[in-house]
């Protein structure tokens, strides 16, 4: 392979790579604002200037192609002087907003000013004044004074979101960003511009002024908003999810995620209507009880039913581990064949970027861990029909609000003698239930999802329930988590009394004299691997942070 030398280090590069790409691939950081690996090159910030031997002047690393034998200096006196000058130029009119800016702590301008700036200003003149609180759209606030005109947001809108909604207006130090006349910055991916903005010019109207980055823990997990399974970081402060941001995975979502997934897939975890402990219905009235009492009551009632009198509804919102335990419980404990899950497909809400029509994260995983009718068993629609006829008298539903699908299903559920629901939040289905058992949300447990392309990916706990301890669970910890005391106000975040569905099922099985006895999510997954050839050779370490494509999907991909 061809080679270049960067700061005395000889590195290999691929033909067609620029200097900044070759350096980055080999762990060498060249400062940059406007360059982004998934966007076109604009070359307008000039902070990536480097000295290249045998070239008459400094070159920008983002648009200069690497050539065999090239010698590059990123820290020479000439380079550092130019970089310092560029930083000084950018800071002339930049406001001192760091104490109130959402970007503080993850701001490239802040970082580079410390590393590459002069440390003081030579300018006494009044800074330029621009509009500071401009609502570009329903989700984005723009601060013109902070903008350094890198054009990342414009290029993202044009090239990734495929909607030309932003542009530069005016010239020189008066330049600013606006939407085109009559347009609003409202495409389904606008909040990605907040992530790629190197300063605090673009902020999320949902997250604005809510938390400092150093006060939050960050956990690598998966967005459950659709079958794409975007890789995300979940940011938590005081045991409350504050925001979600996309995490790079070239095989799934690149650097992006949709606005709907970012804003609507975590707030239910923090909601006031969380199921906190078990609920049983006695004489028509709801009664809060411990999880153990709820399980004892459920086991006692379930003993009255068997075979075709009972049905089980799993969930494409639940993990592979939850669904496997649920299916094993139904089949081994009750010899039940009436088992299925509801599908949520919206063909009108899909694009060729990220958003999928399947609005669940684990349809394939649910079906292939046992949530499907057994021999002679009924599918979801048939189960509902048999409930209407009162041939099915008992139903167990896991992590799905099936009563909200339509009024006919809601009416059918009212005819049941026994409805047991494992749920995260109060909903239309829990209101009809005779017993409600509190299930942990996806943000409170370990597990796996399989996306529409057959990539199995891990979710990890970012929020603790009553029985969990952040340090003992090996969870991500913020500065507050590490050094706070029980007397600090922010150290007393709300914890709900809930358990993962696989654990509730295991406890139910034990009460009924069954064989299920799982202690950890990994125990369930190991059993899936042993019994299902689709998962052969996998474990949590193999899946890692980027996920693994299952063998059967690899073969399909290779054939295509």
Language-model segment annotations:
Residues 34-39, 128, 521-528:
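Short linear loop/turn motifs
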Residues 1-16, 24, 36, 51-55, ...:
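N-terminal export/assembly segments and adjacent metallocofactor-ligating motifs
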Residues 305, 322-323, 329, 333-534:
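Non-catalytic alpha/beta scaffold blocks inside enzyme catalytic domains
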Residues 22, 50, 156, 257, ...:
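Hydrophobic/aromatic ligand-binding patch that stacks against planar heteroaromatic rings
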Residues 62-67:
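Structured interaction patches on ligand/partner-binding surfaces of diverse proteins
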Residues 521-560:
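Long, low-complexity segments enriched in small/aliphatic residues
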Residues 19-53:
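A basic, amphipathic helix-loop patch mediating RNA/tRNA/ribosome contacts
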């Amino acid at each position: 392979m061809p080679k270049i030398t960067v700061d005395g280090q000889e590195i290999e590069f691929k033909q067609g790579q620029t200097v900044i790409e070759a350096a980055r691939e080999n762990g060498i950081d060249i400062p940059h604002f406007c360059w982004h690996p998934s966007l076109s090159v604009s070359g307008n910030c000039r902070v990536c200037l480097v000295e290249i031997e045998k070239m008459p002047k400094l070159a920008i690393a983002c648009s200069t192609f690497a050539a065999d034998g090239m010698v590059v200096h990123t820290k020479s006196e000439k380079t550092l002087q130019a970089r310092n000058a560029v930083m000084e130029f950018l800071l002339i009119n930049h406001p001192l907003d760091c104490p109130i800016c959402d970007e503080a702590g993850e701001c490239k301008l802040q970082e580079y000013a410390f590393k590459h700036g002069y440390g003081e200003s030579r300018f006494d003149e009044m800074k330029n004044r621009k509009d500071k609180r401009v609502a570009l759209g329903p989700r984005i606030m723009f601060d013109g004074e902070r903008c350094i005109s890198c054009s990342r947001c414009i290029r993202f809108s044009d090239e990734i979101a495929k909607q030309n909604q932003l542009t530069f207006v005016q010239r020189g130090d008066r330049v600013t960003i606006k939407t085109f006349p009559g347009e609003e910055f409202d495409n389904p991916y606008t909040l990605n511009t907040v992530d790629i903005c190197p300063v605090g010019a673009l902020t999320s109207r949902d997250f604005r002024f809510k938390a400092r980055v150093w006060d939050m823990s960050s956990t690598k997990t998966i967005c459950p908003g659709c079958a794409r399974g975007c890789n995300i970081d979940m940011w938590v402060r005081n045991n409350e999810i504050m925001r979600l941001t996309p995490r790079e995975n070239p095989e799934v979502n690149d650097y992006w995620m949709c606005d709907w997934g970012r804003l609507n897939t975590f707030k239910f975890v923090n909601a006031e209507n969380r199921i906190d402990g078990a609920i049983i219905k006695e004489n028509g009235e709801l009664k809060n009880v411990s999880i153990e009492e709820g399980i004892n009551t459920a086991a006692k009632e379930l003993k009255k039913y068997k075979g075709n009198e009972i049905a089980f509804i799993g969930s494409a919102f639940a993990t592979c581990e939850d669904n496997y335990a649920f299916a094993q419980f139904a089949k081994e404990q009750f010899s039940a064949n009436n088992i299925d899950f509801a599908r949520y497909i919206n063909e009108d809400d899909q694009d060729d970027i990220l958003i999928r029509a399947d609005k669940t994260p684990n349809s394939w995983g649910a079906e292939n861990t046992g949530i499907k009718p057994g021999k002679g068993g009924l599918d979801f629609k048939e189960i509902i029909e048999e409930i209407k006829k009162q041939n099915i008298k008992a139903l167990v539903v896991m992590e799905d609000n099936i009563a909200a699908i339509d009024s006919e299903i809601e009416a059918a559920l009212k005819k049941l003698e026994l409805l047991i629901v494992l749920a995260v939040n109060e909903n239309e289905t829990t209101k009809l239930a005779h017993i409600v058992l509190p299930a942990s949300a996806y943000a409170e447990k370990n597990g796996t999802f399989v996306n529409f392309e057959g990539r199995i990916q891990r979710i990890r706990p970012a929020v603790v329930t009553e029985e969990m301890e952040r340090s003992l669970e090996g969870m991500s910890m913020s500065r507050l988590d590490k050094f706070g005391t029980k007397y600090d106000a922010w150290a007393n975040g709300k914890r709900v009394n809930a358990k993962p569905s696989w654990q509730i099922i295991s406890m139910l099985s034990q009460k009924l004299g069954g064989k299920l006895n799982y202690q950890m999510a990994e125990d369930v997954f190991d059993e899936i691997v042993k019994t299902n050839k689709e998962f052969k050779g996998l474990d949590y370490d193999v899946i890692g942070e980027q996920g693994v494509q299952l063998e059967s999907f690899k073969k399909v991909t290779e054939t295509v």
